[in-house]
Protein backbone atom coordinates (compact mmCIF):
# COMPACT_ATOMS: atom_id res chain seq x y z
CA UNK A 1 0.00 0.00 0.00
CA UNK A 2 1.31 3.47 -0.84
CA UNK A 3 1.18 5.90 2.09
CA UNK A 4 2.03 9.58 2.23
CA UNK A 5 3.02 11.34 5.45
CA UNK A 6 1.90 14.98 5.42
CA UNK A 7 4.46 17.69 6.11
CA UNK A 8 2.85 18.42 9.49
CA UNK A 9 3.99 15.03 10.84
CA UNK A 10 7.48 13.86 11.82
CA UNK A 11 9.30 11.96 9.06
CA UNK A 12 10.39 9.51 11.74
CA UNK A 13 6.96 7.86 11.37
CA UNK A 14 8.27 6.18 8.20
CA UNK A 15 10.12 3.61 10.32
CA UNK A 16 6.84 2.40 11.82
CA UNK A 17 5.28 1.54 8.45
CA UNK A 18 8.11 -0.31 6.71
CA UNK A 19 5.72 -2.99 5.37
CA UNK A 20 4.26 -0.33 3.09
CA UNK A 21 5.62 1.96 0.42
CA UNK A 22 5.80 5.10 2.51
CA UNK A 23 6.93 8.57 1.55
CA UNK A 24 6.84 12.00 3.11
CA UNK A 25 5.57 15.09 1.32
CA UNK A 26 9.19 16.25 1.38
CA UNK A 27 10.39 13.00 -0.26
CA UNK A 28 8.02 13.71 -3.14
CA UNK A 29 8.99 17.39 -3.42
CA UNK A 30 5.42 18.44 -2.64
CA UNK A 31 6.14 20.85 0.23
CA UNK A 32 3.76 23.77 0.61
CA UNK A 33 1.20 22.35 -1.81
CA UNK A 34 -2.40 23.24 -1.06
CA UNK A 35 -4.55 20.30 0.05
CA UNK A 36 -6.48 20.06 -3.21
CA UNK A 37 -3.28 20.00 -5.26
CA UNK A 38 -1.71 17.47 -2.89
CA UNK A 39 -4.69 15.12 -3.26
CA UNK A 40 -4.52 15.41 -7.07
CA UNK A 41 -0.80 14.61 -7.02
CA UNK A 42 -1.47 11.63 -4.77
CA UNK A 43 -4.06 10.27 -7.21
CA UNK A 44 -1.68 10.67 -10.14
CA UNK A 45 1.06 8.74 -8.30
CA UNK A 46 -1.36 6.03 -7.08
CA UNK A 47 -1.12 6.82 -3.36
CA UNK A 48 -3.87 5.18 -1.33
CA UNK A 49 -3.56 6.78 2.12
CA UNK A 50 -2.60 10.18 3.53
CA UNK A 51 -1.53 10.44 7.18
CA UNK A 52 -2.08 13.98 8.42
CA UNK A 53 -2.38 16.12 11.54
CA UNK A 54 -4.53 18.66 9.63
CA UNK A 55 -7.89 18.36 11.36
CA UNK A 56 -9.49 20.88 8.98
CA UNK A 57 -8.71 18.93 5.80
CA UNK A 58 -11.72 16.67 6.33
CA UNK A 59 -14.04 19.70 6.20
CA UNK A 60 -12.30 21.53 3.35
CA UNK A 61 -12.29 18.91 0.59
CA UNK A 62 -14.92 17.06 -1.41
CA UNK A 63 -13.73 13.48 -1.07
CA UNK A 64 -16.05 12.27 -3.81
CA UNK A 65 -13.46 13.78 -6.15
CA UNK A 66 -10.54 12.16 -4.36
CA UNK A 67 -10.95 8.44 -3.60
CA UNK A 68 -8.08 8.48 -1.11
CA UNK A 69 -8.20 7.40 2.52
CA UNK A 70 -7.12 10.17 4.86
CA UNK A 71 -6.16 9.23 8.40
CA UNK A 72 -6.48 12.36 10.52
CA UNK A 73 -4.31 11.87 13.59
CA UNK A 74 -6.23 13.64 16.33
CA UNK A 75 -3.87 13.81 19.28
CA UNK A 76 -2.64 16.59 21.56
CA UNK A 77 0.37 17.51 19.41
CA UNK A 78 2.29 16.17 16.43
CA UNK A 79 5.46 15.05 18.18
CA UNK A 80 6.63 11.50 17.60
CA UNK A 81 6.30 10.61 21.31
CA UNK A 82 2.64 11.69 21.30
CA UNK A 83 1.91 9.85 18.04
CA UNK A 84 3.62 6.60 19.06
CA UNK A 85 0.65 5.24 21.11
CA UNK A 86 -1.75 5.48 18.14
CA UNK A 87 0.54 3.67 15.68
CA UNK A 88 -1.08 0.28 16.48
CA UNK A 89 -4.50 1.83 15.73
CA UNK A 90 -3.19 3.08 12.39
CA UNK A 91 -1.90 -0.41 11.58
CA UNK A 92 -5.32 -1.89 12.41
CA UNK A 93 -6.97 0.53 10.02
CA UNK A 94 -4.42 -0.14 7.28
CA UNK A 95 -4.96 -3.90 7.66
CA UNK A 96 -8.73 -3.52 7.39
CA UNK A 97 -10.93 -2.09 4.70
CA UNK A 98 -10.32 1.62 4.55
CA UNK A 99 -12.99 3.89 3.17
CA UNK A 100 -12.22 6.82 0.93
CA UNK A 101 -12.24 10.13 2.75
CA UNK A 102 -11.30 11.07 6.29
CA UNK A 103 -11.08 8.76 9.28
CA UNK A 104 -10.13 10.22 12.64
CA UNK A 105 -7.55 8.30 14.66
CA UNK A 106 -7.42 9.16 18.35
CA UNK A 107 -6.75 7.64 21.76
CA UNK A 108 -9.48 9.70 23.38
CA UNK A 109 -12.55 7.90 24.65
Describe these PLM feature segments.
Residues 17-20, 38-39, 64-68, 85-86:
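Short, glycine/charged-enriched secondary-structure capping and boundary segments
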Residues 28-29, 57, 76-78:
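Short histidine/acidic/glycine/proline-rich micro-motifs that form metal-
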Residues 69-108:
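C-terminal structural segments of small proteins and small subunits
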Amino acid sequence: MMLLIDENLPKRLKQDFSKHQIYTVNDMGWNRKKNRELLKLMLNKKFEVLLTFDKNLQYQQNFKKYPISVLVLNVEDNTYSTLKPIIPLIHELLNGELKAGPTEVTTRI
